[in-house]
A protein has these predicted regions:
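Active-site helix/loop module of the DD-peptidase/beta-lactamase fold
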Residues: 112, 131-170, 196, 225-260, ...
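Active-site-proximal alpha-helical segments within enzyme catalytic domains
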Residues: 213-220, 260-281, 339-356
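Flexible glycine/proline-enriched surface loops and loop-helix/loop-strand junctions
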Residues: 106-107, 197-203, 213-215, 251-258, ...
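N-terminal leader/targeting segments and the immediately adjacent pre-domain N-terminus
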Residues: 2-23, 27, 31-106, 111, ...
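Structured C-terminal helix/loop/strand segments within mature extracytoplasmic catalytic/sensor domains
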Residues: 335-387
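Active-site SXXK
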Residues: 94, 111-137, 165, 217-221, ...
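Active-site Gly/Thr loop motif
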Residues: 243-245, 297-350
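Non-transmembrane alpha-helical segments in soluble domains
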Residues: 76-80, 126, 142, 163-166, ...
Length: 387
């Protein structure tokens, strides 16, 4: 019998060899959990985000407006990685301090803002009230659709007010909740759906995001003010901003699709954001009543949406969204594909994103790109110091 005596050194070496694969696997797992290194200072200094020397915007720099230029440089460095981003603008203290265009975007491009148009429609409701076309947000919806009065089977529809519609609390469901309803949205024939579309909640009782509800708001403004929505909007809103609507799609009855389908340049979208940041005033002219702006930016439904990256506590006002990003309260217009007009009142800042609108394309792939726009803007805002 041969007796084998292992020294302590031999035992330790044997244990070490057995454990080595597990230790290496653990180390790799730990490294994978660490945040990736950000861009170097040299890379950030090479980023060019200076506003283009065209148009009527007053321009400045982050330094002149008290903002860390490296934070802005990192924003634009990250933006360059996004394959569906078109335009990215930052306005601080009323001045354009950063601007760049990517992929198919350009300063001349009239981008399809998708549902960010809803916030514009809300502004036109406020102006219609101010001009006397409408008398109150408590007017009933069916007052403006008398041709369907005899076709209303659900008596609750007679109680729907303009206020309910503005707050997305009219009782009409999200169209994507039912394939037949979704098909109706793309039919191009909308007015009669006031009568035909079913309610799924009592008016005023619950938030339900409905494209048709906003479109009917646009029809109400057009009928009350005796003008198509695009002409009215250009005359009473965008002319005052020295801005121009590129186009605004119409339905089969000739009404502009008030829930979306408007084309604006990124710079003109930024002017609209600046208008709301300044309580409806633009270059000394009160374009939208200040009280209307204040009412529009309140949160009447909270939460109105799940958190999106850094965007938490998402609420809804009069066709405007609200959220908290980091320590900063924000309001924002939001369209499919990642169109964003973000207002930071405490920092006197507007951020505009235009992107591939993914026209008639929905699902996980379009949402992945859309969320990337939220992540881009949200991480930048969260990095900003408090005012």
């Amino acid at each position: 019998m041969i007796q084998i005596i292992l020294t302590w050194h031999q035992i330790s070496e044997s244990l070490w060899r057995r454990r080595l694969p597990f230790l290496l696997a653990g180390l790799l797992l730990l490294l994978s959990m660490l945040p990736a290194c950000g861009p170097s200072s040299d890379e950030l200094e090479a980023v060019n985000y200076a506003p283009l020397a065209v148009g009527d915007w007053q321009v400045s720099t982050p330094e002149e407006q008290g903002l860390d230029p490296m934070l802005v440089a990192e924003l634009y460095h990250n933006a360059a990685e996004l394959e569906t981003l078109y335009g990215l603008l930052v306005i601080k203290d009323g001045r354009l301090i950063a601007e760049d265009y990517f992929n198919e975007g350009s300063v001349e491009q009239k981008a399809l803002l998708q549902s960010a148009a809803k916030s514009i429609t809300s502004a036109l409701v406020g102006i219609a009230l101010d001009r006397g076309c409408l008398s109150s947000v408590d007017q009933k919806m069916l007052e403006f659709f008398p041709e369907f009065s005899g076709q209303i089977d659900d008596p609750r529809k007679r109680e729907i007010t303009i206020r309910d519609m503005l707050q997305m609390r009219a009782g009409y469901p999200p169209e994507e909740s039912d394939s037949a309803l979704w098909e109706a949205v793309w039919s191009g024939d909308y007015a009669h759906l006031v009568a035909d579309f079913p309610l799924t909640s009592d008016p005023g009782s619950a938030f339900q995001y409905s494209n048709l509800t906003t479109h009917w708001l646009g029809i109400i403004v057009a009928r009350a003010c005796k003008s198509d929505l695009e002409s009215f909007g250009q005359q009473v809103l965008f002319d005052s901003l020295n801005a121009e609507i590129g186009s605004w799609r119409k339905d089969l009855d000739g009404y502009n699709w008030a829930a979306g389908e408007i084309h604006l340049s990124a710079r003109d979208a930024a002017k609209f954001g600046l208008l709301y940041l300044n309580e409806g005033e633009f270059e000394g002219t009160q374009v939208v009543p200040a009280a209307w702006v204040n009412d529009s930016l309140q949160s009447y439904s909270l939460p109105a949406h799940d958190n999106i990256g850094e965007f938490h506590d998402i609420g809804y006002g009069y066709q405007w969204w609200s959220a908290t990003v980091g320590d900063h309260p924000v309001n924002f217009a939001w369209g499919h594909g990642g169109q964003l007009i973000v207002l930071l009142d405490e920092l006197d800042m507007v951020i505009v994103v235009t992107a591939d609108p993914f026209y008639e394309v929905y699902g996980s792939e379009s949402w992945r790109h859309e969320k990337a726009m939220f992540d881009l803007v949200g991480e930048f805002i969260a990095s900003l110091p408090a005012a």
